[in-house]
């Protein structure tokens, strides 16, 4: 296969970017929650007036947005306790609550401290007490961290409210089209532009410490891979080899980058040492090998290949060698990504022209379809493994729990967003 044909096939294989008019923030909606969601009341924290109200409202919204909780409206609260010993167990039981969150905010140095408590009003026990310092400009982030503490205290699982989401938004038409790589809180607030370009931006990937993003940019009218530091905006071009430069993925320790290059003819998987720039070729196939993703121990790489005739997922050692085919069910399986516990893979699963998000158990190889399609793509796990974020049709993002019981939609008014990536 010549290089021009390889590039054309690769672009048709990967590029699915929709256009639209972009507004400032993602809007998050719960489209389906858990039946029997846990009732919890987040009482407005005492002191500091509007700051306390705002913080409590964000915490309550986070818990409600997870689909795992049903939060009590502030207007339905008959009392406003600020400490555990003020919580009247029977009164909250009468309101149908299982848990009550109370707290106070106090000035501390140049910022504040939030002292909060989670009370189990069914058992009459204190579940957790926590003190969180935060800066004057960090109210939203502090609220997300508080929601994480509450989520873990009640469910036993880590929360993911304080993480962030990267995505590509597209605006304008023709010569006025703009591609914007953005990072926002998981509730859609605080969007920040990483880079804006007249040419496509693709495949954002977080570093394991959450400080950098690797991405593909066509700003020079051909693909190149950059790594950008979010705090400073400093970026480094790490690959602009002839032909395809695509699908970057950081190794678990952040020292290496798996990527797709066609510099030697066809798209194959390579691993780059980010310190030295040295390249190791991992696959050598006459068709297309692309979309690498690392196992959690850094020893293996899952990738998409058409070597069996149609796109399927394969597993190869991170040092190279023979590849093992993982998927057989369906006409199309691509964009494989390991779960945080390493026990399963999320992927795009195609059958009969519909493309849906599915999860495969790596031990049994059983596949469970989680979404309804018909054009779902780009799955990625939340860092706690509870949800999968993906791109759906009509330029919106969506999220589904790994058991399929909780569903969220994330959209921009009148616009399009693609290529989501959840931060560590």
Swiss-Prot record:
Gene3D superfamilies: TolB, C-terminal domain, TolB, N-terminal domain. One of its GO terms (cellular component) is periplasmic space. Residues 1-24 form the signal peptide. It is found in: Periplasm. Pfam families: PD40, TolB_N. Keywords: Cell cycle, Cell division, Periplasm, Signal. SUPFAM superfamilies: TolB, N-terminal domain, Tricorn protease N-terminal domain. GO terms for biological process: cell division; protein import. It comes from the Bacteria. Belongs to the TolB family. The Tol-Pal system is composed of five core proteins: the inner membrane proteins TolA, TolQ and TolR, the periplasmic protein TolB and the outer membrane protein Pal. They form a network linking the inner and outer membranes and the peptidoglycan layer. Part of the Tol-Pal system, which plays a role in outer membrane invagination during cell division and is important for maintaining outer membrane integrity. NCBIfam families: propeller_TolB. This is Tol-Pal system protein TolB. The gene is tolB.
């Amino acid at each position: 296969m010549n290089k021009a044909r390889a590039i054309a096939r690769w672009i048709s294989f990967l590029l699915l970017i929709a256009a639209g008019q972009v507004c400032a923030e993602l809007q998050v909606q719960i489209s389906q929650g858990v039946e029997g969601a846990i009732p919890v009341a987040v009482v407005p924290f005492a002191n500091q007036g509007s700051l306390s109200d705002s913080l409590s409202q964000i915490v309550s919204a986070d818990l409600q947005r997870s689909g795992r909780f049903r939060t009590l409206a502030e207007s339905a609260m008959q009392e406003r306790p600020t400490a555990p010993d003020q919580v009247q167990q029977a009164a909250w039981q009468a309101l149908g609550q299982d848990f009550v969150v109370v707290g106070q905010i106090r000035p501390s140095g140049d910022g504040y401290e939030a002292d909060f408590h989670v009370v189990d009003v069914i058992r009459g026990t204190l579940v957790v007490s926590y003190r969180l310092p935060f800066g004057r400009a960090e109210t939203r982030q502090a609220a997300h961290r508080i929601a994480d503490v509450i989520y873990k205290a009640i469910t036993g699982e880590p929360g993911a409210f304080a993480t962030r989401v990267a995505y590509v938004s597209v605006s304008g038409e023709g010569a006025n089209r703009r591609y914007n790589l953005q990072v926002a809180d998981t509730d859609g607030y605080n969007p920040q532009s990483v880079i804006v370009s007249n040419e496509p931006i693709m495949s954002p990937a977080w570093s394991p410490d959450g400080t950098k993003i690797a991405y593909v940019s066509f700003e020079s009218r051909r693909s190149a891979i950059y790594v950008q530091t979010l705090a400073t905006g400093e970026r480094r071009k790490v690959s602009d080899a002839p032909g395809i430069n695509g699908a970057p993925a950081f190794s678990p320790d952040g020292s290496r980058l798996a990527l797709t290059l066609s510099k030697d003819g066809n798209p194959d998987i390579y691993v780059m040492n980010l310190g030295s720039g040295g390249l190791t070729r991992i696959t050598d196939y006459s068709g297309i090998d692309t979309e690498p993703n690392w196992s959690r121990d850094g020893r293996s790489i899952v990738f998409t290949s058409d070597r069996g005739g149609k796109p399927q997922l394969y597993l190869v050692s991170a040092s190279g060698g023979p590849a093992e085919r993982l998927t057989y069910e369906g006409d199309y399986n691509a964009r494989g990504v390991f779960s945080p516990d390493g026990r399963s893979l999320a992927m795009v699963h195609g059958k009969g022209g519909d493309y849906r998000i599915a999860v495969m158990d790596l031990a049994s190889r059983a596949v469970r379809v989680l979404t309804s399609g018909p054009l779902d793509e780009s799955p990625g796990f939340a860092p706690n493994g509870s949800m999968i974020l993906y791109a759906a049709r009509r330029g919106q993002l969506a999220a589904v729990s790994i058991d399929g019981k909780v569903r969220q939609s994330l959209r921009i008014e009148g616009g399009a967003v693609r290529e989501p990536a959840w931060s560590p």
